[in-house]
Amino acid sequence: MTIKGFRILVSAVAVYLFASASAVAQPMPVDSLIIKGTLDNGMTYYIRHNANPKGYADFYIVHNVGAFQEAPNQDGLAHFLEHMAFNGTKHYPKKGIIDFLQAQGVRFGYNINAYTSKTETVYHMDNVPLKRESFVDSVLMVLHDWSGDISCEQKELDDERGVIREEWRTRTSPQSRIFELQEAVLYEGSTFPKRNVIGSLDVINNFKREEILDFYDKWYRPNLQAIVVVGDFDAKEMESKIKAMFSDIKNPENCVPKETYKLAPFVHERFENMVDTSAKFLALKVFLKQPYPEVGQRAQRSFYKEQFIRQIISAAVSARMDEQVKSPDCPSSRGVMVSNASRTNLYFSLFTILPRGDASPLSLVDFYCDNANRLIRFGLTEDEFQSAKLKVVKNLKLHNALAPESVTDDQIVAGCVDNFLHGGALTYPSELQKIKMEIMSSLKLQDILDYIPKMFSESEVIYSYFYNPKDGHEIPSEQQIRERIHECAQKDLTFDAIKFKKVDFSIDLPKGKIIKTQPVKGSQTELWTLSNGMRVWWTPADGVKSKTALSVNFVVNTGARAFDPDNIPAEKFAEKFMEKYLGIRGSDKVENMNSPQFEGIPYMVSFSASNAVITTAVAADKADRAFSVLNLLVTDPYFSDARTMKTTIDATVESMRMPRSSSSVFREGFNEVCYNNHPWYSRIDSAAVRALTPELLADVHARQIRDAGATDVYICSSMPKEEIAAFTEKYLASMPAGYAYKLAKVQPKVPSYKGSNEYVRTFEASSKVSKATVSVNWLYNVKTDLRSLCAVDVLDYIMSARCLSQIREQRGGTYSVSFSSSIFREKKGLVQSSVDFETRPELRDTLVNDAYELLSDFCENGPTDEEMSAAKNYLMKYYIKLQKNRQISVVKRNASIQDHVASGVWDEDYKQALSEVTASDILKTARKANKGARLLSVLNEE
């Protein structure tokens, strides 16, 4: 009794000390170049000059209203109104806004878009070219119309109902249902779960024009709006324009106050299950709710400190559970803890715990309580803290320093929007990144220990089983759960902390040589041939100021050719296992990524039908160790311990007992038709999973990764060439030459259908909502010169716009549709163009016919001058942005070199090639597509 009371006293003191430390106000610095003001009508504005990208700007209007402001007869109309903003305004009737902007390369759905949530509605036009003053004035007029002059014409409203219905259909997935069920649990007793943004079909289908106008007139008003403009302009001149343009907008008389929605009072414990008759699994979900910081606290350093602490605790607890589930005696097959904010209403931490085999649902309560009680009683070790901290830094990308000149318009805009809606800090993004890392670096283990009681003991705890009543699970009663919680509290627990392995990174191999160097035409890249037959494509990264100074892509060109033809499914599962666990010298990848020894040395292993790839990107001071790790992944691999292997096998086999989704079954059949039963698509069954052994892993590793003569290594670095050459000879050229296996003759994994084909399957709809998922495909060949590839890009742009106009806007048949092409590097010149969409079954055949007719009509008449101009404007802008990104990132520059080598096409002359593309080129490409092989795939869910 005395000890227990002492612990409570210590916890109380710790929480008080944490609160006291946080109470010392340390405000975040305000970006002095942001001009923030308020017009007489109450409209807020944010303006800032930024020349990245040069000659462009982002334009936003933010409405501090959303679905919460809807009356019962307006359920879904806040979102519907967002759609209507693109269907006619006072100065831009019908599709005038889209047509006006797309003519200047500002593309709908990409640069022109909007979103609606329960609390806000935000419209934006980004990457807008600042070509002339009159054009800028016209763009501001679009924002002006979105503020108070959306037309909502009856015909446009009726035409849009079909589009909204199809968007509603996309939000009936199992994931959407889980999210809504969780919202209902978190916000029980409040109005929050009563609005889901998309609304009800009854309102969508039947509302009157007056009802949406009533919402519009009441809530779209300047004292609830903000204009945000960031880009390459004179900020003072832009402020004058905004004052002149927006000061005339009036607030309605007798403005209705915006209601402040209150949460139900917190209680200590609640028990409320989540029932879904289409659920395919059982899980215990435990929610820990805490209050969210008030507005005045959100621009303080303490705000970020608390968020980081919460993330670190979650990462540490998840890591512990990952270790525990490896034991065959553990009742759980998987446990994870995440900590998030639910808007600005509350913090919550969520445990999701899945049972192992036939473990009782009640045993999952033991698993949660033991972990929570152990954390409260014993805390974390220093190693656990450092490991979790490292993981959070990586997840939040805090280790990537952001240079001031690299800050983009959208990064500045995001801070302004957050400031207006939530009171967030108006700190310049590069400074914000720096301060966040300073806060993270300053955190000590004691900070975590002090916060644990607040996060657990002082939370409202909600115990909730997610289950399908049809499955016959014996779900515990509230009384049974309470009794088990009490029993767990009396347990004499031991401190079960994670123990981290120490890895030896030393290399004892004879150094090899670079035996030949040659420049690569049309680039700064050099090709180095090594003494073991390996090829290294080295590219200098002059001018890159990022902290990441080295990118290495280690590519072994084996893939499906290295499979044992009699054992493909088992070898594919072995590859999946290695993608997650391949490590070095007795420590697997999961352990490595959690180890402070591997701080700043991430690596990724992946396998495809054409190659095996290991990638890493590090700072200059980590380069030596990164190369060492790469060498050891090839020469001294470690796959995992027996316990991890058995746990993975058992969990995978268990998951295979669950009913397969219709989309999974459909994709399997589609791939057989599209890829002509390519071995890469061999299905992994339970027998293949159970065939996993250390010997099989070693054999697959040797087949896929240890062929130096089939290896291309792409290195891009801002480090001196001499250093990279030294690392290359020590760590790459030293890898053993020779290959003990014979590669099979396997065709490249590319579509290979001929003539006209259909693949149609019908399944029972899991969501009780019927839909058809359609893909219309054409397969054809083009020349591989840059001009021909540009023609494919232009065709994609124009046909996407036509499909959007016909299939989405005129038919109201889908929420999203596009015409997109894939160019297969494995078989040069092969192109597959696809039109993809979801729709209601009764419109399926009509829309499929539309897709075919749109391409046929294009082949008859070709593109218009306006379409050619819009496509070239957009593609030119996109290419310039792509080139800019390559200039500031060694990773992106390296990826582009790898792509160029694989394709044989260097896009440095893309601008020239694009300018030379003619309407005749596009017409020829379209006709090739229309004459090519066809494959129609339809997944019906009814």
Per-segment meaning from a language model:
Residues 10-20:
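Bacterial N-terminal signal peptides
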Residues 445-463:
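Extended, domain-scale alpha-helical bundle/helix-rich regions
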Residues 1-11:
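Bacterial N-terminal signal peptides that target proteins for export
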Residues 25-99, 124, 138-141, 213-329, ...:
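His/Glu-rich zincin catalytic helix
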Residues 48, 53-70, 77-78, 95-145, ...:
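M16 family metallopeptidases and their MPP-like homologs
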Residues 100, 149-152, 156-157, 404, ...:
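Peptidyl-prolyl cis-trans isomerase
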